[in-house]
Regions:
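Structured surface interface patches that mediate subunit assembly and partner/cofactor docking
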Residues: 2-8, 14-18, 25-38, 55-180
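Extended, alpha-helix-rich binding/interface surfaces that flank or overlap catalytic cores
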Residues: 45
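Short, conserved "active-site rim" segments that organize catalytic pockets and cofactor/ligand binding
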Residues: 49
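Short, surface-exposed acidic-centric catalytic microdomains
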Residues: 52
Length: 180
């Protein structure tokens, strides 16, 4: 059974802290590196993460979001500050609209955890990742990413087989249909 929203408080905060550190620690010379997301380099991945955070903040505030719309350049001159501003907006929206926490937080945890792994892979910082974040995200993904949901979206493939020795992040990536 999926953990309650209160059970996600610590891993969700840890995922956001982790992403803040990953973005802040990414140097300009790393922006053109490939990522596990074949269609994105580090710059495009960070743009997706920051722009996506702004969209999740809008959802948390009760606004409708067009997820199919292209994300404009969200990096700006200071990607870490832009991410922090989005996080502040998200937290404010949760404070003003607690009724949206259950709908938004688990999905954003999954997104933040898997893209944190992507960014860490691309910038050689996988050893810095908190396994508890991946474990909580995987629990949320197992609850939310049902076979019916997989049929309705192209964002996730079928689960990929992995060895029993896989790390929590590799298990999360494989469950989301990605080769770890």
């Amino acid at each position: 059974m999926f953990p309650g929203v209160a059970d996600l408080d610590l891993p969700y905060a840890a995922a956001l802290d982790q992403m803040t550190e990953l973005i802040a620690g990414t140097s300009p010379d790393q922006l053109s590196r490939p990522t596990p997301c074949a269609e994105w380099d580090v710059r495009a991945l960070m743009n997706h993460v920051i722009g996506g955070l702004e969209r999740f903040a809008a959802m948390a505030a009760g606004q409708s979001v067009d997820w199919s719309a292209e994300i404009p350049d969200a990096l700006g001159h200071d990607p870490a500050a832009r991410f922090q501003a989005g996080r502040t907006a998200l937290e404010a929206a949760f404070g003003e609209h607690p009724e949206n926490i259950e709908r938004v937080r688990p999905t954003h945890l999954i997104e933040t955890a898997v893209h944190g792994w992507d960014l860490a892979q691309a910038t050689d910082r996988v050893g810095d990742l908190d396994p508890g974040v991946a474990e909580a995200a995987l629990a949320a993904a197992r609850e939310r990413l049902t076979p019916e949901v997989r049929k309705r979206t192209t964002a996730f493939g079928q689960e990929v087989p992995i060895p029993a020795s896989a790390t929590p992040y590799e298990r999360l990536a494989s469950f989301l249909g990605r080769e770890p």
